[in-house]
From Swiss-Prot:
EC top class named in words: isomerase
Similarity annotation: Belongs to the chaperonin (HSP60) family.
Highest taxon listed in the record's lineage: Bacteria
Example GO BP: protein refolding
Record text on subunit structure and interactions: Forms a cylinder of 14 subunits composed of two heptameric rings stacked back-to-back. Interacts with the co-chaperonin GroES.
Species this protein is from: Thermosynechococcus vestitus (strain NIES-2133 / IAM M-273 / BP-1)
Protein name, UniProt field: Chaperonin GroEL 2
Gene from which the chain derives: groEL2
Keywords: ATP-binding, Chaperone, Cytoplasm, Isomerase, Nucleotide-binding
Amino acid sequence: MAKLVAFHEESRRSLERGINALADAVKITLGPKGRNVVLEKKYGAPQIVNDGVTIAKEIELEDAYENTGAQLMREVAAKTNDVVGDGTTTATVLAQALIREGLKNVAAGTNPIALKRGMEKAIKTIVDGIAEVAKPVEGDMIAQVATVSAGNDPEVGAMISEAMAKVGKDGVITIEESKSLQTEMEIVEGMQFDRGYISPYFVTDPERMIVQLNNAYLLLTDKKITSIQDLIPTLERVARSGRPLVIIAEDVEGEALATLVVNKLRGVLNVVAVKAPAFGERRKAMLQDIAILTGGQVISEEVGLTLEDVELTMLGEASSVTVTKDTTILVSEKGNKADIQKRVEQLKQQLAETDSEYDKEKLQERIAKLVGGVAVIKVGAATETELKDRKLRLEDALNATKAAVAEGIVPGGGVTLLHLASRIDALLPSLSPEEQTGARIVASALAAPVAQIADNAGAEGAVVVENVRAGDFNYGFNAATGAYEDLVSAGIIDPAKVVRSALQNAGSIAGMVLTTEALVVEKPEPKPAAPANGGMGGMGGMM
């Protein structure tokens, strides 16, 4: 495949055109009065969205050079979304401002490497400033953060605030699509995993097809149980105690399963068998989690235990067990609090060390199941288009809330960056002249989010920036009401982590674009001409 190569100014200008095409489509969504963008879909109805990263992912440009710029800009949004799940539009607006001013200076002959160095030093000063001014989240701030992030939707704010209050900061909140018009929340207490009963003959409530057991013993093993002989000593002990039994094993089959079913149907023993959750090493870890939560032991040959050795003291205990054909929920207060806390600390350590997004998600889920539970928000709406938009807003709000809990909050509406820009003046004397130019570019770009929020609200961006700059740190423009006020008192707050990530990712991409001297893209292949349609052949003569 042949390649096209562009150099110097030509390469940078092509990148800038692509960057502007994407940024101009994304930035109109910023703020409470941000506009919507309609995305055409190959199949189904067009999608109406107000979410920066979703718009960025849809943009592909015809010109290969310009498309490269658009893809770089998409990376800013995607990276910010991966780290904090919100702030993608702010990152895009900042990156566009940094690149626009930076390219003017590179074209005028400034050394791009020195320019980049100055920008990096200025951004570090601002990042340190964000950490200094951030305040911990307290009271109704969680609802305020969620409301702002969901595009000023107080209902969303209240729901996420309630979910956070119920499951705690280590809990897991998931967002699903609802079958109804209402948006509702469901709290799952205790430990839930995606494995149901092995046989429907175990059900205790035939109408709902579920198993409901109270004050049950739990036998946990990583073995496959096929012979009933292994289980007889345990079954006899549990039967004498008069309590139900839940068996969680790799599998229960053959003679063992048949005997358990017969005993259940005859009323000799109230029992249910469930396959252990997950696979391989993760299965062993999850069994251990269940054991710690229920005060039991995992019967495993790795620790020298077999099913014949089981005593009642080795079994876990649960105050309530609910098993459907797909899920199991265990509620137990029998676990040792110190052991549970130790296990949670261990999992948090693993969470800090892993780079895999999948592993992070699974570890976070395991922590949540140990400490408090899971909240499921089911999003409802009148049309599918509205449902998709509402779900995206809820996801943004949830991510912003988690970020606020992690690193605290700062005044919103873009004013934190605008007010911190003055700190760059103190940095200038220590920089070389060309580095100073880079630092000044950052200082002027920090006004871009405030200006864009004002423009989207129908105000004059440059005027708003000057008015806000004259006020104290919390003072800013409330685009929802058109008033200048103390934004923290008005509940307009941003998570510090979102503001920090947006600035760092914007600076990273801007630095790369400014130091680009050549651009290599694939040469588009000419489309083959459509073949001419042949005429119909004549009919042969009849004999």
